[in-house]
Amino acid sequence: MLSMLMTTEYAPAEDRHELQQLLLHIAGGERDALAELYQRTRTAVYGLALSYLKNAQDAQDLTQDVYVQVWDCAEQYRPTGSPMGWLLTMCRNLCLMRMRREERHAALSEEEWDAIPTQECGLDADERALLQGALARLADEERRIVLLHAVTGMKHREIAALLELPLPTVLSKYHRALKKMRSFLEGDDA
């Protein structure tokens, strides 16, 4: 199970080009392109929003806000950048604005964990509970780094840019987080 977090089934070169094309079509006013972008990226956007807001309903609302902003700002995307990075930066910025406004720092409830889509990764209920327990032991920033790498397939360098952290810090926090999770999953920290 932990190996799923260490490697991803992600084809960044193909996805990057396809996402760039979708953004160009969105900038041209094509609603179908927005629907396709939403279908392909919503899990990653929602996961990042949930990691910041810690409330399933707020994360769903913010996810919708991200795609409204994509529709309004698609012409501002520059193809030299990562489309997923652009989208997740937009999500992060909206999350930070909402958190400043509402000053919310609560823990995820059981109901909110259930709202996280895990069907795509093939986890059964027991594995999901174990993973939840392991993730809950991490600091917020460590959890964000692990989820960004595991859910979105982002490279550590992209995560560092998104979170505005030095690459060595991201790598250190990622490996420390995996070590904590491994310890928990092996029963050393139960």
Task: Label each region the model flagged.
Residues 7-13, 27-36, 47-65, 158, ...:
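Short, charged helix-capping/linker segments at alpha-helix termini
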Residues 92, 96, 142, 151, ...:
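DNA-recognition helix of helix-turn-helix
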Residues 72-79, 88-109:
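Arg/Lys-rich amphipathic alpha helix in sigma70-family domain 2
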Residues 18, 42, 46, 56-73, ...:
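Conserved RNAP core-binding helix
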Residues 21-26, 130-139:
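Short amphipathic alpha-helical boundary/capping segments
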Residues 47, 61-68, 81-93, 172:
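Structural recognition of an alpha-helix C-terminal capping motif at a helix-to-coil junction
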